[in-house]
Amino acid sequence: TLLNEEVSPAVEALESLDPDSLSPRQALEWIYRLKNMV
């Protein structure tokens, strides 16, 4: 079941992300950070 699976670090990062508060540069940095996690 889903409850027994570990949550991906990328998913955890996305859950804490507030896209409306990011500058375009910060958003780009997040994309690269998330890409490196998967």
Curated annotation (Swiss-Prot):
The keyword Ligase does not apply. One of its GO terms (biological process) is DNA repair. GO terms for molecular function: ATP binding; DNA binding. Keywords: ATP-binding, DNA damage, DNA repair, DNA-binding, Nucleotide-binding. Belongs to the DNA mismatch repair MutS family. This protein is involved in the repair of mismatches in DNA. It is possible that it carries out the mismatch recognition step. This protein has a weak ATPase activity. This is DNA mismatch repair protein MutS. It comes from Yersinia enterocolitica. The lineage of its organism: Bacteria, Pseudomonadati, Pseudomonadota, Gammaproteobacteria, Enterobacterales. The gene is mutS.
